[in-house]
Amino acid sequence: MDVLLELGNDVARLWATYAPTYLNGVKNTLILAVIATLFGCIIGLLCGVLNTIPYAPHDHFLKKFFLKLIRALVRIYVEVFRGTPMVLQAVFIYYGLPYFTHNEVSFTGYSGMWLASIIIVSINTGAYMAESVRGGIISIDPGQTEGAKAIGMTHWQTMMNVILPQAIRNIMPQIGNNFIINIKDTSVMFIIGFMEFFAVHRTIVGNNFLYFPSAVIEMVGYLTLTLLASFGLRAIEKRLDGDSSYQLAHTDQLTMAAGTYSHPARSSPFDEKSTDQIKKTRLSLKHGRNRGER
């Protein structure tokens, strides 16, 4: 019990002294996670769409060559960035680019750290999102693509107007999952000096050596951020699903199969009201009372 009281006192003392610093770290973490997730989704969307462009055996050689080349490059990108830790990716991008370009390309100053962090987390997120988008596109019924082609739509029109809207809705849980992962994985940006939430913890601990009490604040902070993100994303998913109070009209299955079912707001081709309307229309056409006649 005394240990818990001591822990509470240490946590309270740390928070009273460094609350603005902790909150600044939370702000930087959230901003980086949001921006990187958005850019990562764009990268993943482009890679997923390019990876699913179809080609026929009789297509031109150059078209098939470039499509195969694009798929190979996307595959290499996905495998490399999914198969290596983000902390090493940060080292290679932040320190490797200046090394290979003799400092012609470098990330200097506060803005340079921000730019490097956004690039690193975005590229990493894009590698995961590329496979999610590809899976979302493949999951759509092929009959919808065939129907779109049957009415004269091109591949890009079909993708933009038919496939992608459904695929994006299907991968919303993966987008939310990547956002939550990014909230936590931004902690590796301390390796390049970016002052996110975990880097703040390391700095404060270096000043007062209260490692565990500061870790408790970090744990509570990250858990709060991820829980809020989870609730918010579920609310967005429910909103995308639309109204859940739709009611199905009950009718006899034989009537439905025969095509004689009358919708409450419309008439069927076989009921009395519809027959009278058809007769009136025929008479108006017969006597010239058509559109354009006064």
Language-model regions: role of each:
Residues 1-294:
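Transmembrane alpha-helices and adjacent helix-loop boundaries
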